Every structure is written in structure tokens, then in C-alpha cells.
């Protein structure tokens, strides 16, 4: 009995240390979230220290780029449609001319329309070129997005790996101690927890005493626990 109690205490201490270590590593990774200094938005991003805020910033940039792109496409579509309509009309008139169905006055009118079409086409082409260039520039957020998402993916992978090690360690201690768990009940409880609605983001967290309100509070809590 004493051996089982000692093993249980050792397990609890080990789990406590591993959870604290994992939390400290995760906290440090979130705070020290470095971005490539050559990124177009590196200077602006350097003012944002928290990874969560940086992800929110990326979402905001993505939304702005999407809106900008859609606006430019909406501005470009009428120009393209006009060029298509004018070219089809002129093509029909040119076919009539080739069949000698247009007299001299009609040909002079057609020549005038062709000249106007060429001038208008040049102007529209210049405007379309400018708008396409703006669309291209609006996509520069992708470099930053890729960096942040890759860092977050790496962070999540590391956390998952550490959690797997933690569960494995707990299982080994339980096996040596001869402790058996009701896995059916545990799976049922896990399913209930997954279906239950979470508390969600903390609203007015600064007015509550049971939650931490920022990375500084997390750091203070970990330090007070010896991690």
C-alpha cells in the first residue's frame, strides 16, 4: 500500500512538473513569436508581441486584401464587358462591309467608330493594367500569413507531441502501480465534454478574479508556481 501511495505521489509530482514545463514552453513560444524582418509588414508586426493578436492581425489583413481585390475586380469588369460588346458590334459591321453591304457614308461612319474604339481600348487597357497591378500588390499579405500559420502549426505540433508524452508517462506510472481506469466511462465523459458548449472568450476579463487577462498575468502565475 505504501509503495502504491509513493508511486501515486511520484506520478502527481511528475505530471505537475511536466504540465508546468509544457505551459512555460507554450507561453514562451507565444510571447517570442518572431517574424522574418524582411517581410513587407515586419515593422508593423514588431509592435505586436502576442501571437494571438498577430493571428488576428493576419485575419484583418486578409479581409482587407479580399475586399480590395473584389473592389478592383468590380471596377475592371465593366471595362472588359464594354470592350467585348464594342468589338462584337464592330466585327458585325466589318463583316457587312466585307460583303459590300455598306455604302460610302456607312463606311465613313464605321471608320469613325473604329477610331473611337481604338482610342477607348487604349485608355481601358491602361486602366485595367493599373488595376491588375493593384490586385497583385494587395496579395503581399500572403508572405506574412504563411510565416504566421507555419509558426502556429509548428507550435501546435510541439504541444501535441508534449501532451502525448505526458499521457504516455501517466499511463506508465499507472501500469506500474496497478491502477486501472474505466475507459468506457472516460470516453463517455469526454464525449459529453465535447458536446457541451464552452465558456468562450472572456468578456470584461479585467473585472473577473478567476481568469488571467494577459500574457503578463500568465508569466506571473507560472513564475509563482516555480516554472
Curated annotation (Swiss-Prot):
Key word Disulfide bond present: no
GO molecular function per UniProt: phosphoprotein phosphatase activity
Gene3D superfamilies: Helix hairpin bin
Gene Ontology cellular-component annotations: bacterial-type flagellum; cytoplasm
Main location: cytoplasm
Span list, region Disordered: 194-217
Keyword tags: Chemotaxis, Cytoplasm, Flagellar rotation, Hydrolase, Protein phosphatase
Biological process annotations from GO: bacterial-type flagellum-dependent swarming motility; chemotaxis; regulation of chemotaxis
One Pfam family, short name: CheZ
Cell compartments where the protein resides: Cytoplasm
Enzyme class: hydrolase
Site feature (Enhances dephosphorylation of CheY-P) residues: 147
EC number: 3.1.3.-
Subunit structure: Homodimer.
Function: Plays an important role in bacterial chemotaxis signal transduction pathway by accelerating the dephosphorylation of phosphorylated CheY (CheY-P).
Similarity-based family: Belongs to the CheZ family.
Protein name: Protein phosphatase CheZ
Species name: Pseudomonas aeruginosa (strain ATCC 15692 / DSM 22644 / CIP 104116 / JCM 14847 / LMG 12228 / 1C / PRS 101 / PAO1)
Protein's gene: cheZ
Amino acid at each position: 500500500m505504501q509503495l502504491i501511495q509513493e508511486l501515486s505521489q511520484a506520478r502527481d509530482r511528475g505530471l505537475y512538473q511536466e504540465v508546468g514545463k509544457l505551459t512555460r514552453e507554450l507561453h514562451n513560444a507565444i510571447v517570442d513569436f518572431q517574424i522574418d524582418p524582411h517581410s513587407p509588414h515586419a515593422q508593423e508586426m514588431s509592435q505586436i508581441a502576442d501571437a494571438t493578436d498577430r493571428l488576428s492581425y493576419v485575419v484583418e489583413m486578409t479581409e482587407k486584401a479580399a475586399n480590395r481585390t473584389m473592389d478592383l475586380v468590380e471596377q475592371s469588369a465593366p471595362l472588359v464587358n464594354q470592350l467585348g460588346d464594342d468589338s462584337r458590334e464592330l466585327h458585325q459591321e466589318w463583316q457587312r462591309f466585307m460583303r459590300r453591304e455598306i455604302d460610302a457614308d456607312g463606311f465613313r461612319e464605321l471608320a469613325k467608330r473604329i477610331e473611337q474604339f481604338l482610342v477607348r481600348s487604349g485608355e481601358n487597357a491602361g486602366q485595367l493594367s493599373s488595376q491588375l497591378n493593384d490586385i497583385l500588390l494587395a496579395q503581399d499579405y500572403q508572405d506574412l500569413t504563411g510565416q504566421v500559420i507555419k509558426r502556429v502549426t509548428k507550435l501546435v505540433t510541439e504541444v501535441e507531441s508534449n501532451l502525448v508524452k505526458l499521457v504516455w508517462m501517466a499511463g506508465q506510472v499507472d501500469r506500474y502501480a496497478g491502477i486501472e481506469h474505466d475507459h468506457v466511462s472516460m470516453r463517455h465523459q469526454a464525449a459529453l465534454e465535447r458536446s457541451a458548449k464552452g465558456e468562450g472568450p472572456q468578456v470584461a476579463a479585467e473585472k473577473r478574479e478567476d481568469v488571467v487577462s494577459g500574457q503578463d498575468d500568465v508569466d506571473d502565475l507560472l513564475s509563482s508556481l516555480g516554472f
